[in-house]
Design a protein with these regions (language model features):
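A short hydrophobic/aromatic micro-motif that marks alpha-helical segments and, especially, helix-coil
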Residues: 33, 92, 102-103
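Polybasic "coupling" helices that flank or enter modular domains
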Residues: 2, 96-112
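Cyclic-nucleotide recognition modules
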Residues: 12, 42-95
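Short helix-to-loop capping/linker segments positioned immediately adjacent to catalytic or ligand/cofactor-binding
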Residues: 13-15, 83, 106-109
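Regulatory nucleotide-sensing modules
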Residues: 1-34
């Protein structure tokens, strides 16, 4: 099941520690990924997938995601495994998303 929801600045899309209910796709706006009181990164590219790691690993959310400005987010309330079987193209998008995050993390670690 999927639904699209509008968020106002400061609204939380996902909360750290929550059980995964699927994953999300940013349709418009800017989101902040927050750990504690620190903003880790911003998401502002339409089509960006987030929240997928908790779904893949079956673990609680590791950070908060909140709207920095008005944002539109699609919630996919279906397991990624089931979705990949129905739409194999989503697997390529997920692999790309995870690879880009790994690249960014590696780059950040190199500069420490």
């Amino acid at each position: 099941m999927q639904n699209t929801k509008a968020y106002e600045p400061g609204d939380f899309i996902v909360k750290q520690g929550e059980a995964s209910q699927g994953f999300c796709i940013l349709k418009s706006g800017t989101l902040e990924v927050v750990k504690g009181s620190k903003v880790i990164t911003e998401l502002d590219v339409p089509g960006t997938i987030f929240g997928e790691m908790s779904d893949i690993l079956g673990e609680p959310r590791v950070s908060d995601v909140r709207a920095k400005d008005e944002a539109l987010v699609m919630h996919i309330e279906k397991s990624i495994d089931d979705l990949i079987v129905q739409d194999p193209g989503i697997a390529k998008k997920l692999i790309y998303t995870i690879a880009k995050r790994l690249e960014q993390t590696t780059s950040m670690l190199e500069h420490l």
